[in-house]
Amino acid sequence: MIRNSIKSISDYPKPGILFRDVTSLMEDPEAYRATMQVLIERYSNTGITKVIGTEARGFLFGAPLALELGVGFVPVRKPGKLPREVISESYELEYGKDILEIHVDAIVEGDKVLLVDDLLATGGTIEATTKLARRLGGVVEDAAFVINLPDIGGAERLKGIGLNVFSICDFDGH
């Protein structure tokens, strides 16, 4: 049910790309609930103290997961979107660089942090997010995704920085 609710859009956002649209999953309340239940069952009673969601679709899965786990939710955002003092981390995109930010007081030394995003492709966003959380003293060992595109290699990249990678659905291609 979860996999079948994710629509594939050809040539979006550019020719040659087959885009996996997780918003179609969220339009189906049974599929969305089933997705959240998989994450809740996997991460209940694991000692997680904070869930970080990356802008923007990571919020849609990370925040309800944190609520169900009874832990804090921490948004990681693009520059200028967070009101309190932040630290930043730049990372490489396919064509250029981007920056992510986190509040300096969102993670405390020893927090066991779970990273959540909708889709894993190159792993650059989650690698930068891992660096931010670790700089603040967080213990980051796990990253969870609704969708993984294994042909792109992000899971291997994240395993290389010490993360356990979990995804609900793997899709071939780019």
Swiss-Prot record:
Pfam families: Pribosyltran. GO terms for biological process: adenine salvage; AMP salvage; purine ribonucleoside salvage. It comes from the Bacteria. One of its GO terms (molecular function) is adenine phosphoribosyltransferase activity. Its EC number is 2.4.2.7. It catalyses: AMP + diphosphate = 5-phospho-alpha-D-ribose 1-diphosphate + adenine. The keyword Transmembrane does not apply. Pathway: Purine metabolism; AMP biosynthesis via salvage pathway; AMP from adenine: step 1/1. It is an enzyme of class 2 (transferase). Keywords: Cytoplasm, Glycosyltransferase, Purine salvage, Transferase. The keyword Cytoplasm applies. SUPFAM superfamilies: PRTase-like (SSF53271). InterPro entries: Ade_phspho_trans, Adenine_PRTase, PRibTrfase_dom, PRTase-like. One of its GO terms (cellular component) is cytosol. It is found in: Cytoplasm. Catalyzes a salvage reaction resulting in the formation of AMP, that is energically less costly than de novo synthesis. Belongs to the purine/pyrimidine phosphoribosyltransferase family. Homodimer. This is Adenine phosphoribosyltransferase. It comes from Photobacterium profundum (strain SS9). The gene is apt.
